[in-house]
Amino acid sequence: MDQSKMRRTNQFRKTSQKPPSTGIDSYPTPAQSPMAQHETPMWDFNSLNPYFSMLNMNDGINYARHQQNHIVTSRPPTPLTDLMSLRSFQSFPNVFMPVSRSRTSSFIQSDTDSSRLESDDFSQNVRCFSADIDRSKSYGSSKHYHLKYSRPALSRNSRSFTRSNNVLPTWSLDSNGEMRSRLSLSEVLDSGDLMKFAVDKTGCQFLEKAVKGSLTSYQKFQLFEQVIGRKDDFLKLSTNIFGNYLVQSVIGISLATNDDGYTKRQEKLKNFISSQMTDMCLDKFACRVIQSSLQNMDLSLACKLVQALPRDARLIAICVDQNANHVIQKVVAVIPLKNWEFIVDFVATPEHLRQICSDKYGCRVVQTIIEKLTADSMNVDLTSAAQNLRERALQRLMTSVTNRCQELATNEYANYIIQHIVSNDDLAVYRECIIEKCLMRNLLSLSQEKFASHVVEKAFLHAPLELLAEMMDEIFDGYIPHPDTGKDALDIMMFHQFGNYVVQCMLTICCDAVSGRRQTKEGGYDHAISFQDWLKKLHSRVTKERHRLSRFSSGKKMIETLANLRSTHPIYELQSSGHDSFKTDYFSTASEHDGPELEKNGIEEGSLMLEPRSNKSSVSVKFSSSGSHGDD
């Protein structure tokens, strides 16, 4: 707390009478002698705060000798429990007398939040206490004080959210300041005060309920004129927290009323929104009005409204905005592709793609576009020309994505786009392109990335068997072991905080294939033997490193996966060979007699790179800092 503020708010206040609205009542007995009046002043220690420790204790005696009976308080109410233990107070037993209180000391770190608030967090003349106290205390025979601390009805710290009707016109309120129960919509429309009702919570709720009822033609005309008839009023209501709901309702009524003014109203609505398209898209409340208009307007006018979207950097701002991105998603959902094809071309631009995909809201826009272009491939209502347009747009966007798939796969948000492409069977062509162009020969490094490891998992789960075999071979035999430690790619990934999830995925795939839960045939060729060979290699490595693995939750999951397979689906050659390594007790936690066999190395948090067996690249050992995974 600011020292200057502390000095201002914590000065002792001397009052001979009860201050107004303090919640402290004083009931004096008949007057005593002048000397008796100076003997028993009362000090309220519930109000003292740390500044009290800097005061001169002699001030208390001076107040007691020269002032009449008084109550000394300070704000904010910060209770103090340890003051009476100070040696200084032992000399003044009759001067300093604590008032009972029901809170603990504010010096304790675990005290309530209200004890740590500043003076600005409280009302001017309100005392806040945690419980009501109504006690009488007698100090000697000269004076009786009756103190009553009551919880205030309203303070800045415990603010009541009861609505104030200051916005509504006085003629609409009753004697209690509330809206009249028999108020009608016609009165509001005839008065010309509809704007005041629309920006008030209760007033807007009244209008919302009223317009849903049966309306006369004249009432509709008045609504249209006062809500969507004037541009300034329309924009003011559209950007208001309450008024935007009324605008949406009136737009729905307007578009459902097919009278002589139907076309004129829609054209006017389109012009109003088009003139402020960017600002309304970026507004938290006006963006809902745009979405409602796109949903309900005639398609021809809605398409013209889409053309009002900017084609420059402002479109990036709309795509990555928390509110405006929903406008783009609504355009993609309800407007034909030929009217928003420019959005696809804009997003597919390399620099724009990087900015939009790397944003938490922009990545959702791109994924929505991909989903729409993919889903329309099954739409039989589309003409051949529309299908050709869809395929070309999808190809342009996918080409831009695959050219930067490695950069996108390692991004916090863009990796979801790559995951979606890899896991979607309708995008199998682009999935294979991503695996071959981006993931192959980089599996070890990407598996050690926090976000790219999810992409690698999806690739193992959804890759065609031919590519899956290449990926498995790369992990098992695609890298030269480290010259100093002898670690190969599987060993590094098995004990890495992110790579271990990829190994678990590989193990699950092999177990499912061997147990018959996964298809092993593709293109007339059965890969069952390959799955058995991969499982043997994984089983051998888990057996070898069982003690280290049993120390981590990820390792225990690998051990448990093999143990479950042993109990439900016996492995042919492993079981027939009499090897008992699938028994659960064989994977028990390492004991103290294991000695050097138990290494001290834990889960790796850095990225260890190995040299591929192919001569395409040679990478030295490199560690990069990453955040630890909560599972380990």
Curated annotation (Swiss-Prot):
Record annotation: effect of changing K137 to A/D: Abolishes interaction with dlc-1
Effect caused by changing Y479A: Reduces thermal stability and disrupts interaction with lst-1
Domain PUM-HD span(s) in chain numbering: 162-566
InterPro entries in the cross-refs: ARM-like, ARM-type_fold, PUM-HD, Pumilio_RNA-bd, Pumilio_RNA-bd_rpt
Mutation effect (S136 to A/D): Abolishes interaction with dlc-1
Chief location of this protein within or outside the cell: cytoplasm
SMART domains reported for this sequence: Pumilio (SM00025)
Effect of P28A: Abolishes interaction with dlc-1
Ranges of compositional bias, category Basic residues: 1-11
Entry GO MF terms: mRNA 3'-UTR binding; RNA binding
Composition bias type Polar residues, residue spans: 12-35
Effect of C363A: Increases binding affinity for 8 nt target RNA by comparison with 9 nt target. Complements phenotype of RNAi-mediated knockdown of puf-8 in vivo
Region listing for Disordered, in residue ranges: 1-37, 609-632
Biased composition (Low complexity): 615-632
Keywords, in A-Z order: Cytoplasm, Developmental protein, Differentiation, Repeat, RNA-binding, Sexual differentiation
Cell location: Cytoplasm; Cytoplasmic granule
Spans of repeat Pumilio: 187-225, 226-264, 271-307, 308-332, 345-384, 400-436, 438-473, 484-521
GO terms (BP aspect): cell differentiation; negative regulation of translation; post-transcriptional regulation of gene expression; sex differentiation
Effect of H454A: Reduces binding affinity to 9 nt target RNA
UniProt miscellaneous comment: Fbf-1 and fbf-2 are >90% identical on both nucleotide and protein sequence level. Experimental approaches often do not distinguish between the two genes, which are collectively referred to as fbf and are considered to be functionally redundant.
This protein's name: Fem-3 mRNA-binding factor 2
Organism of this sequence: Caenorhabditis elegans
Top-level taxonomy: Eukaryota, Metazoa, Ecdysozoa, Nematoda, Chromadorea
